[in-house]
Design a protein with these regions (language model features):
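Extracellular adhesion/carbohydrate-binding repeat motifs centered on closely spaced tryptophans
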Residues: 1-215
Length: 215
C-alpha cells in the first residue's frame, strides 16, 4: 500500500470499494475486505468473504470471475457459480437443487460425482452433467440400476415394464441379467437383457419348463 494505492503483480489502483470484487489494472479481479485490504488466501480454493459469499481464490489473491450462472471446471474440480462470481456452497457437504436438477456439493465447494452414500441410501451423481440420476434406469460400471424420483437406488424389488416384462434388482441395486436367482421360495431365470423368462427356455445346456407365481 502506498498513498492509498494497492500494488498487485506490478500494477496499482486506487481502491474505494469494500466487501466487494474489483478489477485491477492487470485485468484480474480481487476481493476488497470491509477494512479496505485485498483478501489474501493461504492457497487456491473456496473461501468465505466478509460479505457472506464464497468465491474461488487463486493463490495470488485473484478471484475466478464469471458473469453467467453455471458449472465451470477449474483444474480437475467443477464448481457451480452464480452470475456474481460467488460459488454455490455452504461449507458443508449437501444436496442443492438448481434449475430443476440436484447436485451434491462438497464441504470444499466442488461438485461431487459417482456414488454417494447417505445413511442406508445410495445415490449416483453423473460424471458428465454432475446432476443426480433420478426416476430412471441407467448403466453404471456395466450394471443397470433403478433410481426412484428422489435419486435413491431401489434394491431387492421387481420392476414391471409394458405390462408383461419383469426385471429384478438385487440387494445391491443391480439388475439381474443372464442368470438364475432364488427370490423368496422360488428360482427365477433372467435373459441377457434382464427380462424374466417364462415357459420353455434353454439354460446351461438344459431345457427348462418354467412355472412361477408371478402373474
Amino acid at each position: 500500500i502506498y498513498n492509498g494505492a494497492y500494488y498487485v503483480e506490478g500494477t496499482a489502483k486506487d481502491i474505494s470499494v469494500s466487501s466487494a470484487l474489483t478489477k485491477l489494472d492487470n485485468g484480474k479481479y480481487y476481493y476488497i475486505t470491509a477494512s479496505g485490504t485485498i483478501f489474501k488466501p493461504s492457497g487456491s480454493g473456496i473461501y468465505k468473504a466478509d460479505n457472506g459469499r464464497r468465491y474461488y481464490f487463486y493463490s495470488n489473491g485473484s478471484v475466478e470471475h464469471v458473469t453467467k450462472t453455471g458449472i465451470r471446471k477449474i483444474g480437475k474440480k467443477a464448481y457451480y457459480f452464480n452470475s456474481n462470481s460467488s460459488v454455490k456452497s455452504t461449507g458443508k457437504t449437501h444436496f442443492a437443487k438448481i434449475s430443476g436438477k440436484t447436485y451434491r456439493i462438497s464441504s470444499k465447494g466442488y461438485l461431487l460425482t459417482g456414488w454417494q452414500k447417505i445413511g442406508k441410501n445410495k445415490y449416483y451423481m453423473s460424471k458428465k452433467s454432475y446432476a443426480r440420476i433420478e426416476n430412471k434406469t441407467t448403466t453404471v460400471s456395466g450394471h443397470k440400476y433403478w433410481f426412484d424420483k428422489t435419486g435413491k437406488v431401489i434394491t431387492s424389488k421387481w420392476k414391471y415394464k409394458n405390462g408383461s416384462r419383469r426385471y429384478y434388482f438385487d440387494k445391491k441395486g443391480r439388475m439381474l441379467t443372464n442368470t438364475s436367482k432364488k427370490i423368496g421360495k422360488y428360482v427365477y431365470f433372467f435373459n441377457k437383457n434382464g427380462v424374466l423368462q417364462r415357459n420353455l427356455i434353454s439354460y446351461k445346456g438344459y431345457n427348462w419348463v418354467l412355472s412361477h407365481p408371478l402373474k
